[in-house]
């Protein structure tokens, strides 16, 4: 059953940009992302193509907007993360929150990721930037102090963990995403052993 906050979100009037993003995601769930044009998205959204291009000059700009929407939802749901938990458990919860948000459009996300991996350097660079922003957000939500070279290393480690969990999640057919959770827990446990040797390790919080 939908909770009160979900009901509130569903009653809010969508903006034209949200309509464009959702139209793109619907198409991506049905066909390869690299085969979709802005004209296709405009037709799906039932808006003039010129109006869509005014908001999104390129498909990449549309994906950036979608990425920001995901970040906003993760930020809102991340308030449920308890600072009483150790850092490893906080990171586990934060990553699962992000995957849960992406789960609203899993088929579309899979299509976009496949196209990104086969895309041009500009698309790949944008994907790397989005990953870094997402991992930075996760560390912030979990109360990890910002700044320092050590944090840069932590971001790289967490990025690899997240990408591996994402790979499993895209193919996870268990009702409770059990395979994904097991993969993520195992990776975070291994990272815990590695990063405990570093000062202010993100996985070395209160026990």
Protein language model features and the residues they cover:
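Basic, helix-initiating cap at the start of DNA-binding domains
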Residues: 1-31, 39-40
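C-terminal peripheral helix-coil segments that are non-catalytic and often amphipathic
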Residues: 2-7, 140, 171-207
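Helix-turn-helix
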Residues: 19, 27-65
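Alpha-helical DNA-contacting segments of helix-turn-helix folds
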Residues: 28, 60-70, 74-75, 112, ...
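Amphipathic alpha-helical interaction segments
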Residues: 40, 93, 111, 153-164, ...
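Hydrophobic alpha-helical connector segments
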Residues: 65, 79-111, 118-119, 129
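Amphipathic alpha-helical packing segments from all-alpha helical-bundle domains
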Residues: 121-144, 152-163, 182
């Amino acid at each position: 059953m939908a909770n009160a906050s979900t009901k509130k979100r569903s009653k809010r009037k969508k903006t034209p940009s949200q309509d464009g993003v959702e139209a793109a995601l619907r198409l991506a769930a049905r066909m390869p992302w690299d085969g979709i044009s802005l004209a296709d998205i405009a037709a799906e959204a039932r808006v003039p193509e010129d109006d869509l291009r005014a908001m999104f000059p390129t498909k990449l700009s549309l994906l950036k907007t979608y990425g920001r929407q995901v970040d906003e939802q993760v930020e809102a749901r991340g308030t449920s993360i308890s600072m009483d938990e150790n850092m490893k458990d906080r990171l586990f919860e934060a990553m699962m929150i992000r995957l849960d948000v992406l789960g609203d459009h899993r088929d579309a996300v899979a299509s976009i990721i496949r196209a990104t991996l086969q895309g041009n350097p500009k698309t790949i660079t944008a994907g790397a930037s989005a990953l870094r922003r997402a991992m930075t957000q996760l560390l912030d939500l979990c109360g990890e102090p910002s700044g320092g070279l050590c944090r840069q290393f932590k971001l790289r480690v967490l990025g690899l963990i997240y990408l591996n969990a994402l790979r499993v999640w895209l193919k996870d057919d268990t009702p409770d995403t059990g395979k994904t959770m097991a993969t993520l827990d195992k990776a975070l446990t291994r990272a815990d052993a590695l990063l405990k040797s570093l000062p202010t390790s993100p996985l070395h919080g209160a026990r």
